[in-house]
Amino acid sequence: MSVIQELHRQLVRKERSATEITQAYLDRIAQVEPTLHSFLTVTRDRALAQAAEVDKRLAAGEEIGLLTGIPLAIKDNLCTYGVRTTCASKMLEHFVPPYESTVTEKLQAAGAIMVGKTNLDEFAMGSSTENSAFGFTANPWNPERVSGGSSGGSAAAVAARECAAALGSDTGGSIRQPAAFCGVVGLKPTYGLVSRYGLVAYASSLDQIGPLAPTVTDAAILLGAIAGHDPKDATSLRVPIPDYTQALKPDLKGMRIGLIQETVGEGVQPEVKSALEAALKTLEALGATLVELSCPRFAYGLPTYYIIAPSEASANLARYDGVNFGFRAEGASDLLEMYMKTRAQGFGAEVKRRIMIGTYALSAGYYDAYYLRAQKVRTLIKEDFARAFEQVDVLICPTAPTTAFKAGEKTADPLSMYLSDLMTIPVNLAGLPGLSVPCGFDSNGLPIGLQLIGNVLQEATLFHVAYAYEQTTPWHQQQPQL
């Protein structure tokens, strides 16, 4: 039984009240936060007030949904009405949104309880949470290691049982890579399946919101609650949303799974490769047919992404100038100086780096050579995936080339940090769904993630394969000792 299902069972049978469950998670947060720093804001009073409302409904004999009374954490780049939303940036340190994001509105309507807002790399730009203006989030399995990024706070909170599940956002791997590093399940849905309204934009053609959860079932429940068309998001897809839990079947007879050859070569940690090989044997034993295939342009994903994403970021982040909201620098003698001082003092080094890259790529003399060419390569990557899905139902590869690295190890070398997302970035460029599921541990006791990639809107297929694998392996049952 999943964490959400077990908590729901306890509530319905009146074994525990919503207040008791919420208080237990808040106590856990208080216990481990000095070590982890998963949260930027803990909404203690609000959470207990929400729990009290759920208890009133239960006392009145009301039937409740699966998410009613379930404590969840929300990445701090999702707008929450009346609750500070910082994007882990000095620029928005005191910003309190006047509106609610669609996904958090849906969770509220489902009766879920928000216990807090989680840490991230500033404006979701990074792979370790070390770019947060408010300190990095430690890995629950080893606090000297990073939790991944940019949704490191959400991944660590789920792994450390500070919440039942969490929401993150994924632009180039920001849900899946931290999920792998922290040993939890993380899904980046098909582009447009989940509304982006109220998500503070980084790269709008790549950003997507998704669940991080302790089990595949929990992730399926959470996706079902947040997916669906939204007129407030022009890129939102008008498609029916199935009950994803119906796809959770234990055997894989007839399933064709393709191993992407380009993802098991140089640069992959040997223990990650071994875990992948063991996972492939397990999937075969469950009835799947394995096919080795090539996505020749997979390797071009990284350079393509680091032209397209910064280009979109340079446009999206132009709004932070000290005029309407957020941080405003003091001591400027005129408007131009105020703009310059605000942006110089308000943004961190990595955000400035990406704005500069993007502005350069979009400039008149370089637009064709960089941005336009990157968009053409993006199309070729999509075509590679389309050809692969003519042969198989699901593609498979490691989520990340390595397990979690030490804090401070890669901060001086941005390129080595960018390589953490080598396996995840092409999935965003193609707009496909990708899921990371735990598949073992290395010799240092650090989790390893297995990435499953599906065709457009094939989340149910990913859940099916991940669930079958999860049910025959012990990885999801292991928890960090904190």
UniProtKB/Swiss-Prot annotation:
<protein>
    <recommendedName>
        <fullName>Glutamyl-tRNA(Gln) amidotransferase subunit A</fullName>
        <ecNumber>6.3.5.7</ecNumber>
    </recommendedName>
</protein>
<comment type="subunit">
    <text>Heterotrimer of A, B and C subunits.</text>
</comment>
<feature type="active site" description="Acyl-ester intermediate">
    <location>
        <position position="174"/>
    </location>
</feature>
<dbReference type="InterPro" id="IPR004412">
    <property type="entry name" value="GatA"/>
</dbReference>
<keyword id="KW-0547">Nucleotide-binding</keyword>
<dbReference type="GO" id="GO:0005524">
    <property type="term" value="F:ATP binding"/>
</dbReference>
<feature type="active site" description="Charge relay system">
    <location>
        <position position="75"/>
    </location>
</feature>
<dbReference type="Pfam" id="PF01425">
    <property type="entry name" value="Amidase"/>
</dbReference>
<dbReference type="GO" id="GO:0030956">
    <property type="term" value="C:glutamyl-tRNA(Gln) amidotransferase complex"/>
</dbReference>
<keyword id="KW-0648">Protein biosynthesis</keyword>
<comment type="function">
    <text>Allows the formation of correctly charged Gln-tRNA(Gln) through the transamidation of misacylated Glu-tRNA(Gln) in organisms which lack glutaminyl-tRNA synthetase. The reaction takes place in the presence of glutamine and ATP through an activated gamma-phospho-Glu-tRNA(Gln).</text>
</comment>
<feature type="active site" description="Charge relay system">
    <location>
        <position position="150"/>
    </location>
</feature>
<dbReference type="InterPro" id="IPR023631">
    <property type="entry name" value="Amidase_dom"/>
</dbReference>
<dbReference type="InterPro" id="IPR020556">
    <property type="entry name" value="Amidase_CS"/>
</dbReference>
<dbReference type="GO" id="GO:0050567">
    <property type="term" value="F:glutaminyl-tRNA synthase (glutamine-hydrolyzing) activity"/>
</dbReference>
<keyword id="KW-0067">ATP-binding</keyword>
<dbReference type="InterPro" id="IPR000120">
    <property type="entry name" value="Amidase"/>
</dbReference>
<dbReference type="InterPro" id="IPR036928">
    <property type="entry name" value="AS_sf"/>
</dbReference>
<comment type="similarity">
    <text>Belongs to the amidase family. GatA subfamily.</text>
</comment>
<keyword id="KW-0436">Ligase</keyword>
<dbReference type="GO" id="GO:0006412">
    <property type="term" value="P:translation"/>
</dbReference>
